[in-house]
Design a protein with these regions (language model features):
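Tandem CBS (Cystathionine beta-synthase) repeat/Bateman regulatory domains
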Residues: 1-159
Length: 159
């Protein structure tokens, strides 16, 4: 369809490559994760294992929750735990040959989607921001290149 073609025109810009995405290793101490998360603009970042395989996500709230008990804040607690102790593990991921409809559906509830190869190796992320840029491009270009006409009552019944 014309809409899908226009959306996918900028497809090469959708993937932020792994080397440009902040991440932490699952065995890193939480103190390291806190440092990395405080330096990046993402609320969550990917967690990888030694083989660069995607294993989960971690956010600043996951780290901060471990620092608090009922009466105080203990920064030393961050050295007692690893990223693996608090990371989110049931995270939707997509393969390198992803489907646009699936990506759009998943990005409703996530600001980005991890992209992995067949061996779960982390390849990068597709962000909601990049998809919205493509939607904006499509909205501006659709009527420049295509005649958009309303369907008749009869044509609408066919759907």
């Amino acid at each position: 369809t014309a809409v899908k073609e226009l959306l996918l025109e900028k497809q090469e810009t959708f993937l932020v490559p792994a080397e440009n995405v902040a991440n932490v290793m699952c065995l890193n101490p939480l103190s390291h994760a806190a440092l990395v998360l405080s330096q990046v603009r993402y609320s969550k970042i990917p967690v990888l294992d030694k083989g660069d395989r995607f294993v989960g996500l971690i956010g600043l709230t996951d780290v901060v929750d471990k620092m608090f008990d009922l009466t105080s804040v203990d920064f030393e607690k961050l050295n007692e735990f690893t990223v693996a102790d608090v990371m989110e593990v049931n995270v939707p991921v997509i393969g390198e040959s992803w489907d646009l409809e699936e990506v759009l559906h998943l990005l409703v509830d996530a600001s980005f989607l991890p992209v992995v190869d067949d061996n779960q190796r982390f390849k990068g992320i597709i962000t909601r921001k990049e998809i919205l840029k493509a939607v904006n491009h499509m909205a501006h270009e659709l009527e420049k290149h295509h005649l958009v006409l309303p369907k008749s009552e009869e044509e609408m019944k066919v759907i």
